[in-house]
Amino acid sequence: MKIETKIAKFTKPLYLESGRILEPWQIIYETYGELNEKKDNVILITHALSGSHHAAGMYEGDRKPGWWDGLIGDGKAIDTTKYFVISTNVIGSCFGSTSPMSPIHPGSSERYRLKFPVVTIKDMVKAQKILLDSLGIRHLKAIVGGSMGGMQALRFAVDFPGFCENIIPIATTYQTKPYVIAINKSMIEAIRADSEFKNGNYDPDIIKQNGLKGLAAARMIGYLNYISPKTFERKFGREYVKTDGMFELFGRFQVESYLEYNGAMFPKWFDPLSYIYILKAISLFDISRGFVSLEDAFSQIKDKLHLISFSGDTLFFPEEMRDIKNYMDKVGGKCNYFEINSDYGHDSFLVELEKFDFIISDILKGEV
């Protein structure tokens, strides 16, 4: 599989939903496979909260492959012998696209930090569309994304009707609910409460080296909602860390050790400000904003919508995706709904690929 990483730089302003602008700005992306002569074999991959453009394959020195490697590649569900796959890093993220830690002016040593404008899912999608236009791509075979990536897929369908043959949102919602907004708020405040966050004026190199307890705590909060109680039970039970005494005040169960380790590792590769800004974008997501009603928003969709949810998702509940199906039926849209039986939790879209990869394969073959 041919893999390339590129950065597209733009000097024309990116006008944001808030009324503010980014100028100049850039977006980093990864491609897999070969673009055909007609440029009609393109699939766009959109990532979740802490994801990146590196969705598949491995580079020299990588510890593990891209986050959807089991789905993308030669002979896989998203077959790179047939399709040219583009995976972008969203505006606001910390892997190479314009973000809070980007220079506030070209050549400046001053970074945006908290002066960075609030970005929305709509802004992320607008940036992706500008990228595709710059590549001469006028139509997509499919857009596939899970969680926040599914929000981007839905937003694309509403904002650019007819641009894509198949829209495949996975484990997502049409409107972030108060429960998730509350979770996101808890994570944001955990970061802000850490004195080493310094109101966004931290040294990123020091954070990568020493970590940030507030971001680690935020990540632990997140894990409680990405993995189901049954999965925690299966993986850890009530086992205690062998080196810890059971009656030590800070002695740990295995599950506590797991949360501590993953929380501590997270700041070494993900930026605290990017985490805050992307959480805010997720909280703000509402597909009906700018429209008279939800029905009005969904009536804009002219493409085939294929919804994939998981029965045990406790972040974006399957009922929310069933609501999308109901709205699409009301407005006479083309929509399929698949509910996967799983008790793993929200992160099923990352770890249980074998339960839905064949659905994506069939969609791309035109068999659904």
UniProtKB/Swiss-Prot annotation:
Gene3D superfamilies: 1.10.1740.110, alpha/beta hydrolase (3.40.50.1820). InterPro entries: AB_hydrolase_1, AB_hydrolase_fold, HAT_MetX-like. Its EC number is 2.3.1.31. Pfam families: Abhydrolase_1. Substrate binds at residues 219, 347. It is found in: Cytoplasm. Belongs to the AB hydrolase superfamily. MetX family. It is an enzyme of class 2 (transferase). It catalyses: L-homoserine + acetyl-CoA = O-acetyl-L-homoserine + CoA. Transfers an acetyl group from acetyl-CoA to L-homoserine, forming acetyl-L-homoserine. Keywords: Acyltransferase, Amino-acid biosynthesis, Cytoplasm, Methionine biosynthesis, Transferase. Pathway: Amino-acid biosynthesis; L-methionine biosynthesis via de novo pathway; O-acetyl-L-homoserine from L-homoserine: step 1/1. This is Homoserine O-acetyltransferase. GO terms for biological process: homoserine metabolic process; methionine biosynthetic process. Residues 41-352 form the AB hydrolase-1 domain. The active site is at 147 (nucleophile), 313, 346. Homodimer. One of its GO terms (cellular component) is cytoplasm. GO terms for molecular function: homoserine O-acetyltransferase activity.
